[in-house]
Amino acid sequence: MKTSLQKSTRFINCTISGIPKANAILCKEGSIKIIGLSSEIVGDKTIDLRGGVVYPGFTDSHLHLLGIGISLETLSLTNITSPEKIIEKIVKKLKSINEGQWFKGWGWDQNNWRDTGYPTKEMLDAVSPKSPIYLKRIDGHATWVNSRALTIANITKKTQDPDGGKILRDNYGAPTGILIDSAMELVRQFIPKYSKADKKRMVLKAVSQLNSLGITFVHDAGTDLETIEILKNLISEKQLNICIYAMLTNNHKVYDNYLKSGPFFDNKGYLTVRTIKLFLDGALGSRGAALLHPYYDNPENMGLILLDIQKTIDKVKKFNSAGFQVSIHCIGDRANRIGLNILETAGERKLRNRIEHAQIIHPNDIKRFADIGVIPSMQAIHCTSDMHWINKRLGADRLNEVCNWQSLIKTGTIIAGGSDAPVESPDPLSGVYAAVTRKDKAGEPAGGWQGHERLTREQALLMYTQWPAYASFLENKTGKIKLGFQANFTVLSKNLMSVLPEDILKTKVLFTIVNGKVVYAE
């Protein structure tokens, strides 16, 4: 007997992950209505999935949506192997701007250079004495500026470091041109803001890129009011092709009204606003991550704590009582310990509070995540990017604290997986590969870096599907191919459970489907 639904879409010619006897899915109004055999299902519209393997739509649990869009329109300095080559690239691009206009770039990483020391303002002054230059580091926690930018911001020898930030200085106390964490704002406040139209264009570019990678859902780590308004407008215009779980930025102008009104839910599942993002420390690459012991390569430095602890405790209580989850950025082991202390003191377990990154965790704190009910949101690709230089930052004795995925899972917690894009590539297949191998794309090191912490393929898939759904309170709506669930699918050319590890990277995205609509086809 054949089953049909009006105004429905039938997806056929596929293998469905976890449902071996089915080869078709019928969807209507954005949800899954029937899973079965194509010979028994009739739809108003039929889409041939070309023999692909259908997975629950992949979710990235931590990225920066507008940041991705900005990166697509800004000079990229990623994977450049020396400051001299960066200067060459800047010189070519400077020809396209007017003298005195702000020049921006992003993505430099001194860890990729032979001399891994920080660059200086003089390098930029030599090619641009009159146009201010602002170059954001790959992690977004440091910036490299020239003297003109420092002059505009009135940063001199006498300028004190702001709370939660650092102005790097030479032996005479003069700023070198490197600003860490909150010190970046001293210059950034003078850069012209993007218009709403600019932001809309950038968001759409970001969504298009994410769709092409098989991503159907994202957790946006730091969303301001204007971006939320843009997203709502895109929903009403039926232009938003991705589902978004928005983390409010830590600014009272952004969150005050939400504290009064409570969380926001779009009834189509495109937008949820029910968490706030806090930054407790900086990043490891720029030595702002807060450590329990000094940096191995900078013994005077233990990193930065960016928040007042008591005020943060009060804020967690306030947000949890209003029904909002709290997501705290913690990279270093000191930050993770303090973050856990804060959430243990002030958090409500039912709010599923999160720690974003959880990259370096003291062994004594591993079990606390499960005990307190805090969800670690981690990015597998950070492990394989950082492993080549992290020994310089931490020394050999602390490497057992880094990216302890399997140790965390064994205590009973889940891990929400993501990329931190544009810091890393948003490609979830690169993330799955990193999670199951702990190797770089060249296949090094043999056995994987700290290979005992590798994930199984099943765990890696959960990290991009069911676990993010739970981390966003949506485990009964998305993250599975199940009747009544949101019709979000990622269709791949290969079966991730059976291909060789290196072939995960060769797997193609054939289709991306959001709310039953094909938003990307190869």
Regions found by a protein language model. Give the residues of each.
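Short, conserved secondary-structure segments in the cores of folded domains
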Residues: 7, 23, 477-480, 509
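A generic structural signal for residues embedded in beta-strands
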Residues: 34-35, 105, 489-492, 521
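Non-cysteine beta-strand/loop elements that form the S-adenosyl-L-methionine
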Residues: 64, 270-288, 372-384
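Divalent metal-binding segments
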Residues: 4-28, 32-259, 278, 283-335, ...
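Acidic (Asp/Glu)-rich catalytic clusters
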Residues: 234-238, 262-268, 348, 369-373
